[in-house]
Amino acid sequence: MLQAPSSSNSGLNQGNAAPDGPPNETQPYEGLDAAAQEEIKELARTLTSQSSLLSQEKRITGTGDPNTLTAASSSSLSRSIFASDIKGVNPILLDVNDPDYDETLDPRSENFSSVRWVRNMAQICENDSDFYKPFSLGCAWKDLSASGDSADITYQGTFGNMPIKYLKMSWRCISRRLFHRTHGKSEDNDSGFQILKPMDGCINPGELLVVLGRPGAGCTTLLKSISVNTHGFKISPDTIITYNGFSNKEIKNHYRGEVVYNAESDIHIPHLTVFQTLYTVARLKTPRNRIKGVDRDTFAKHMTEVAMATYGLSHTADTKVGNDFVRGVSGGERKRVSIAEVSICGSKFQCWDNATRGLDSATALEFIKALKTQATITKSAATVAIYQCSKDAYDLFDKVCVLYDGYQIFFGPSKQAKKYFQRMGYVCPERQTTADYLTSITSPSERIKDKDMVKHGIMIPQTAYEMNQYWIQSEEYKQLQVQVNKHLDTDSSQQREQIKNAHIAKQSKRARPSSPYTVSFFLQVKYILIRDIWRIKNDPSIQLFTVLSHAAMALILGSMFYEVMLSTTTTTFYYRGAAIFFAILFNAFSSLLEIFSLYETRPITEKHKTYSLYRPSADAFASTFSDVPTKLATAVTFNIPYYFLINLKRDAGAFFFYFLINIITVFAMSHLFRCIGSVSKTLPQAMVPASVLLLAFAMYTGFAIPRVQMLGWSKWISYINPLSYLFESLMINEFHGRNFPCAQYIPSGPNYVNATGDEVTCSALGSIPGNNYVSGDDFIQTNYGYRHKNKWRSVGIGLAYIIFFLFLYLFFCEYNEGAKQNGEMLVFPHSVVKKMKKKGIVSEKKKKNQPTLSTSDAEKDVEMNNNSSATDSRFLRDSDAAIMGNDKTVAKEHYSSPSSSASQSNSFSKSDDIELSKSQAIFHWKNLCYDIPIKNGKRRILDNVDGWVKPGTLTALIGASGAGKTTLLDCLAERTTMGLITGDVFVDGRPRDQSFPRSIGYCQQQDLHLKTATVRESLRFSAYLRQADDVSIEEKDKYVEEVIEVLEMKLYADAIVGVPGEGLNVEQRKRLTIGVELAAKPKLLVFLDEPTSGLDSQTAWSTCQLMKKLASRGQAILCTIHQPSALLMQEFDRLLFLQEGGQTVYFGELGKGCKTMINYFEAHGAHKCPPDANPAEWMLEIVGAAPGTHASQDYFAIWRDSEEYREMQKELDWMERELPKRTEGSSNEEQKEFATSTLYQIKLVSYRLFHQYWRTPFYLWSKFFSTIVSELFIGFTFFKANTSLQGLQNQMLAIFMFTVVFNPILQQYLPLFVQQRELYEARERPSRTFSWKAFIVSQILVEIPWNLLAGTIAFFVYYYPVGFYRNASYANQLHERGALFWLFACAFYVYISSMGVLVISCIEIAENAANLASLFFIMSLSFCGVLATPNILPRFWIFMYRVSPLTYLIDALLSVGLANASVVCSSNELLKIVPPSGMTCSEYMEPYMQSTGTGYLLDGSSETECHFCQFSSTNDYLATVSSSYSRRWMNYGIFSAYIVFDYCAAIFLYWLVRVPKKSKKLKK
């Protein structure tokens, strides 16, 4: 609707003039038959729907009376659209003070008319068509077929079978490729299954196509195929798709923005406001040939305001879009944001996948009307897949395509479809809408055969394959072939040139003509950068936390080295190196968590790429720039305080060089981590290489192991490590040109006071005998091999890495697509699949037309009969007349009787004896209000809502999107977590007790389930924990089986829930949601929030019949519903109708045919409800619920002043007064908050969680793979380290690096915990399934065994390669110390888990929790005594050394690994001393060696030169770092106590922060 439209109105109905089918034989006139009558009705409905645009126009302009409007002719629509009163004025420069001001063109006006605005834009284009270059785009496809990458059944990957599964898949892939290469065959369709069977179609400019079919029929795949969005499945090479002469490849590469697919899910940046979201899109789609005299930003702002006004979003402009976890606009409003986003794009060919899901009936109809207006005026084309299509909406479509299990069974004019299927042999019941009738054809239990045709033995197609064959041989198919071939054969060179010129005219100056994008790369980066700045401004928590944590770490780490670094002697050599090493590491790894944010925004980037808004590389470039301020802020807050606290060289040049190097470090590593994130498909895939690189770069920086000491096989790592060059520059920067006074001479003491010259030497490396100082250049040359000439070389290398990683990151972002999603399929546990194969239910190779496991039972029976029939029979006859009679009878009941359903009849008849919990209690509420705090006060969401739900009744809760329907359910069910509730809520006149939440069933709008559980397991879990404790397991299991039977879930009862696309489909998930609540046997009532949302009409009907069935068994049901058909509406007993603001406009009986409700509104001033109108759409229209409509009066005030309201108040007063007298209160046992004991809850929840871990192989294998690779890498880096001084230091640093796996493993765990917590807090806690104690304790218990296993693996791949066992063998303690090391390794991995639970228990966002854990870990590691020994710490920080848990771990690992062995110095570690003349080395050094108690001489008898080693035992070396083997068991006990403390603190913090406290939220 919001594009620059075409000026020409010729050919508006192009393609609509197809013949009406085969000519009928001449017959005697017998009056109007049923088909003719139906045709007249169809025409009347079409004309009525077309006149709705005119009536809307009249209401807006003030002409005509909406109460007396009648159907207009089709030409009225054209006159309305192309009326001459629109002259084409500039709507952007309107001035309210201008006498010619037209408020209907001003989106900020309440009287804005989107229809007039589009007409006005059309007139502007017509006035200067050479400038605006209008064009149109249609599409035709021939032999379109698509296949998925896997079969329709697969087994679930687990920790045990995942390696074998992947090996099999790899082998299959390799062998297939080799086979095809050898035999020269195509890979297409070799493995996997066909989603779409060959089909044809054609949609011309100005047309609307509706695609109908049940979930799983292939509607989504068809839309994706014709919108060039085929990632995840393959299109057959034989397929031909053309868009006015352009191939799908050309469209994808050059004109992608003109063909757009809008997915069913609403994915947006949650922290952007509605205005910011749409304004960004408008900027990126602002054409160069826009209205003259208007700049880009003004035009984009106007288009944004028009979109918001058109779709009723103006009031939400400054509200965050939000998502399931970030509070924002309502679900219906979020769907409208998605619609507005595509409308602003102005694409000429749009594909909408279930775009009306979540919208109320009136808004959904207005959306289709808007599409119709857009198509008619702008000559665009739209294809819409709708599961629930109302009569009025269907009448607006030009063509319809019906799909059945991937087969096309009709494509043609929407007015002919009904007659086609009636001719095929299926009857349309009188009360059924055409769309519902067409969809019902694809459901064996819903469709009704023509009794006369059956009696005469006429064969009626039944299976999808038979209907497809019937379609291929029909006259309608031949007509379609003519249209498609005409489209394909038409010379389209002129149209191609027209489209090409129009595309170039829209593009900004610097955009390439062949580019599919409207604006240049520079403008894309600019606009996305602004968007990212808005996002950060709206939610700066992560950035603020990062900056503040860096500042805190600078103060902590800097003060740790403060005292020792005040000295400038040689004692600071090690600490200066350690401090610089710490600075490099901290700056380098501060960007590791950016990987998290990449995966959060990737789906949005991929969506916008398909809209041709911007290149993914532009988004990547902008995101890099948007993070620059945060990076600079963190660099300043960390490096400046840190530099001066650790007393590095006080020289301006040295300081700025230090700052420059660390800035380079930050950006080089940031780009590297972004590269890893962009090249990986999933977060676990990214974290494993990131953790390995983190470890490798840290170890091969040059501090832990100087390059001269590195093993030959691994030295190359230091050469490709950017940090090694940057560390070298910082060391040169600090040590060059400085002489450090010697702090310790060897030998020293009273006996050596008079020693001179070569008789003493400084103990530091690089010393020269006789000198009282050590040159900094000599030190770094001797120890590290660094030379001053390389100082600036490293800067160049660092900058080269930044540029290289940046371009690599942009490349991967541009060309690496996201993870593929397989075709929709059921997933079963491996054991179930084995049983199914034994029984012959599935086989390794599927036959071409074999029924799938998603096929319904009824159709399965039909197809099985077909397989056993004669092969020469094209169509099946029903073998039993009784079956056909039953079909007709059932269908009559379906559409005539309000109490039965065809689709449910069989299952209900089998399950009539199911003992559903019956309730006698009446649930009622009075004057219920709900207020939430906002910036300037409070906002009322519910305004004095009254009502009741009685046993055995079905009450509908209806209202526009955002009217407060879900909020009302949440308030009544005690599920609100903020705000103030006032009013009274009673059960039989008594206040709700604490057992109330578990005594009700609440089916949420979102189908929240544990994705790794099976359907049966989910139901049993609910039954075990929510049914009474005194009910036996056998009874609960039996009841679950009955629920499975009632809900018709037997076919997939053992299937894994999974995620949409790989698991249960939308319908199956909705049934499971209802089943989980039924399995709990709610004794009071059942709440259902949008149970029919996302379902097709037949499933929605079945769901409604299920609710009716439950009500007939005594259940009280309150159900919100968005798009009820007229048929569905009549199934409800009562209606609670809310308007915007949570205000009641009606509560009472619906009456037969909704007459009672209709009479009420008509009696209070509403215009008459047309006889064939949907009462739901009519009543939403009269209260102004649809965008662009307004109520003619205040229906809330009318309701409060009505007689019906007064009668309701009397009834409520009677209930409050009399009901407590008639019933007794609940017993103490019944009032328990939970049905089962805490211990039983912990047992079951832990059991379920253990299964989830086992069935989440990526998490476990990532954990173990990270452990194996990291520890093995450390082990072989320090392979068989000796006991020289450098070898001892290497072993100490190996132990230090052993703990570096902390961050990667913890970061893998946090998202898994968050998923568990979201499910628990959203569904299981509110329903009182189990307590918070059971939740947190089970999280703790289940992690421990896996971490013990990880610790065991780490021990074996680390302990033996490093060679610690050799030190133990010297003291004959091999087994004891090996066992001790294993205990500490296991304890450390359990500690990682305990810290993870601790930080995430009270923090919402995993990224913030990871930052906090990293902060704790760095502090613990810094103060553990390795980098800074206790003797050099300031007195203030001594307590940190004592409270750091790693102090005790490192102390224990050092002593267990190194103690009780001899030191053997290497040649360059031996100090050379010349003894006085006449003395041997032993005589000269003996006093010194006795005073220090350590050291040894290589040759004591020498009189010329002594070679002295400073240590003789590893125990002496351990003493320098305050480590002792005697404290090993004390250290183990203290470290274990820290683990226990973490777990206890996690439990306490979870209770403190996240458990709702009992408060008096409900006030009178």
UniProtKB/Swiss-Prot annotation:
- SMART domains tied to this protein: AAA
- Which residue stretches are annotated as topological domain Cytoplasmic? 1-587, 862-1304, 1512-1564
Which Pfam families does the annotation name? Answer: ABC2_membrane, ABC_tran, ABC_trans_N, PDR_CDR
Compositional bias, Basic residues, is annotated for: 839-849
**Residues binding ATP, per UniProt:** 959-966
Keywords, ordered alphabetically: ATP-binding, Glycoprotein, Membrane, Nucleotide-binding, Repeat, Transmembrane, Transmembrane helix, Transport
This protein's membrane topology, according to the annotation, is:
Multi-pass membrane protein
GO terms for biological process, alphabetical? replication-born double-strand break repair via sister chromatid exchange; xenobiotic detoxification by transmembrane export across the plasma membrane
Q: Where is this region: Disordered?
A: 1-37, 839-872
- What highest taxon heads this organism's lineage? Eukaryota
Q: Name one GO molecular function term.
A: ATP hydrolysis activity
**Which parts of the sequence belong to the ABC transporter domain?**
174-430, 923-1166
Q: Name one GO cellular component term.
A: plasma membrane
InterPro entries linked: AAA+_ATPase (IPR003593), ABC2_TM (IPR013525), ABC_trans_N (IPR029481), ABC_transporter-like_ATP-bd (IPR003439), ABC_transporter-like_CS (IPR017871), ABCG_PDR_1 (IPR034001), ABCG_PDR_2 (IPR034003), Drug-R_PDR/CDR (IPR005285)
Cell compartment(s), UniProt: Membrane
- Renumbered to this chain, the Polar residues biased-composition regions fall at 1-16
Residues bearing attached sugar chains per UniProt: 754
| Spans through the membrane | 588-608, 624-644, 674-694, 699-719, 732-752, 841-861, 1305-1325, 1340-1360, 1390-1410, 1426-1446, 1459-1479, 1491-1511
Give the matching PANTHER family. Answer: ATP-BINDING CASSETTE TRANSPORTER
Alphabetical list of NCBIfam families matching this protein: 3a01205
Give the family per the record. Belongs to the ABC transporter superfamily. ABCG family. PDR (TC 3.A.1.205) subfamily.
Name of this chain's protein: ATP-dependent permease PDR10
Protein species of origin: Saccharomyces cerevisiae (strain ATCC 204508 / S288c) (Baker's yeast)
The gene from which this protein is expressed is: PDR10
